[in-house]
């Protein structure tokens, strides 16, 4: 069993881009930024508990931080983890709040 405190820390924010909005409409998939050390089981459990939806599948990947240049220094941004969460048909997990 996962503690309530850990559940609330696993899901960081929705990842909104052109690609994610298309996948949300076509494939009923939501993309979230999650903790680097979160497992698929923890992510699935957190989504079920917090949003009360049925999860069909989860795919995760780690995104490497970009190197940015500031004057004469090179700074690397933090690495982060992204989760593609496919929600079962009939369930809706909409962060943007489209009213149609």
Curated annotation (Swiss-Prot):
Pfam families in the record: Ribosomal_L23
Disulphide-bridged cysteine pairs: none
Keyword Thylakoid assigned: no
InterPro entries named among the record's database cross-references: Nucleotide-bd_a/b_plait_sf (IPR012677), Ribosomal_uL23-like (IPR013025), Ribosomal_uL23/eL15/eS24_sf (IPR012678)
Biological process annotations from GO: translation
Gene3D superfamilies listed in its UniProt record: 3.30.70.330
Taxonomic superkingdom: Bacteria
Entry keyword set: Ribonucleoprotein, Ribosomal protein, RNA-binding, rRNA-binding
GO cellular component: ribonucleoprotein complex; ribosome
UniProt GO MF annotations: rRNA binding; structural constituent of ribosome
Protein purpose: One of the early assembly proteins it binds 23S rRNA. One of the proteins that surrounds the polypeptide exit tunnel on the outside of the ribosome. Forms the main docking site for trigger factor binding to the ribosome.
Subunit structure: Part of the 50S ribosomal subunit. Contacts protein L29, and trigger factor when it is bound to the ribosome.
NCBIfam families: PRK05738.1-1 (NF004358), PRK05738.1-3 (NF004359), PRK05738.2-4 (NF004363)
Membership in a protein family: Belongs to the universal ribosomal protein uL23 family.
Protein name as annotated: Large ribosomal subunit protein uL23
Protein species of origin: Buchnera aphidicola subsp. Acyrthosiphon pisum (strain APS) (Acyrthosiphon pisum symbiotic bacterium)
Annotated gene: rplW
